[in-house]
């Protein structure tokens, strides 16, 4: 038997705690998010300038896409961060209606039905437009 010296609820709290920096950058990403497709899809992005301002690393962005997905009425959440000039790391999460692995694989990425990602080149708006075409097809398909 292994004793960790922590009560179960204490472990959950410590595992879910974020640094002040991580909380600030998540807050900014949530504030700057945009809903589209009648609110069924949401997107947010953090550019390199913002990453540098906060002295953030990619790991500091963990959890943002999940927080976006948890918004009531959202079927698909997209979070992107700029890795290079006109290049983005894209993370997608869905609830039930969208197979984000299909979307990601079209752009050379992969993952699971509810959690997937890829790397895309182009402007932020071009990337979102390209992703949204594939997401919209799935959402419309659900309605007939």
What spans do the regions from the language model cover?
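Hydrophobic helix-and-loop "lid/oligomerization" segment in the mid-to-C-terminal part
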Residues: 3, 8-106, 111-144
């Amino acid at each position: 038997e292994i004793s960790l010296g922590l009560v179960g609820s204490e472990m959950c709290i410590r595992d879910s705690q974020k640094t002040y920096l991580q909380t600030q950058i998540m807050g900014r990403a949530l504030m700057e998010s945009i809903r589209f497709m009648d609110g069924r899809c949401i997107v947010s992005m953090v550019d390199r300038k913002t990453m540098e301002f906060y002295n953030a690393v990619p790991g500091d962005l963990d959890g943002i896409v999940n927080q976006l997905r948890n918004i009531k009425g959202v079927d698909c959440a997209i979070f992107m961060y700029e890795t290079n000039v006109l290049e983005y790391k894209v993370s997608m999460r869905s609830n039930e209606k969208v197979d984000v692995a299909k979307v990601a694989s079209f752009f050379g990425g992969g993952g699971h039905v509810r959690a997937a990602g890829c790397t895309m080149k182009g402007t932020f708006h071009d990337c979102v437009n390209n992703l949204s075409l594939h997401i919209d097809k799935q959402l419309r398909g659900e309605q007939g």
